[in-house]
Amino acid sequence: MNEARAETGGPNRTPRSEIRPAVSANRKKEPVLLLDLSTSMNWGAADEYDPEWPDAGSRRAIVIEALHGLVRVLEQEDSEAAGDQASGDDERGGLMTHGFGNRYVEIGDLNSSNLERRLNEIKWGGKTYIMPAWKAALADYDEEFGDRDPDEQPTMLTLVVTDGEADDWMEFEPVLEKATAKRVFVVAIVGHGRKHDATLVAYQQAARKNAARDKFGKVHVEVVSFDAVTDPEEIALDLITLVS
């Protein structure tokens, strides 16, 4: 294997050789991030004895650093973000982000200018209720693109970054099962251990059910495990491959 593409992490880490773009390059897409803010995101990424947030080895710190790498690439593709930041406005343009924990948190556009500040201003902690964030993301997309002809609407590419199965999984699983070529999901799972592995299995099963519904057997839910990965650059590069 090419050493530059070698992966680190635990036994369930998705091989990097299997990671590919979720949406083909010739299709227009609108990426959106659903970010897990639950308490366990403060825990260590690779071991239960690892130091917690604000240590650089915590899941939260690693994810924030990885998102820096992702948004830098995405804003090169986003003329609005580039224009807004050139004019000194870092509030607009970037990766539209919705947080989920005990409740929905509207985070807004994340870009390289505001990411650190925005993610440190919000309240982290609690359980893992994802549906309110998904509904908000869908409403945002419909507001921006709903009046366009269906052929002119970009693919809604939803990146879910999480470390655990949703507390409202029974509601979210059918959303994944019904994913389409116009509504694609990438699920990136960080953390380690039994909780990570159970989460991975649940999302993989939803992805298989989704593929079974497609008459051509195509998969519209990509599930990637970052089992015990502690290198944010490695995660960023894989997210860039999946989303950009």
Mark where each language-model region is.
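VWA/integrin I-like adhesion module and closely mimicked acidic/polar interface patches used
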Residues: 127, 164-211
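Surface-exposed acidic, glycine-flexible loop patches that form ligand/cofactor-binding
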Residues: 22-24, 73-89, 139-153, 176-180
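Short beta-strand-loop
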Residues: 79-122, 197-205
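Acidic, polar low-complexity linker/tail segments
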Residues: 1-52
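Von Willebrand factor
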Residues: 103-107, 113-155, 166-168, 189-198
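…and closely analogous acidic/polar surface helices at protein-protein or active-site interfaces
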Residues: 28-29, 40-92
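DG-centered beta-turn motif at the end of beta-strands
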Residues: 35-38, 63, 70, 97-100, ...
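C-terminal helix of von Willebrand factor
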Residues: 205-244
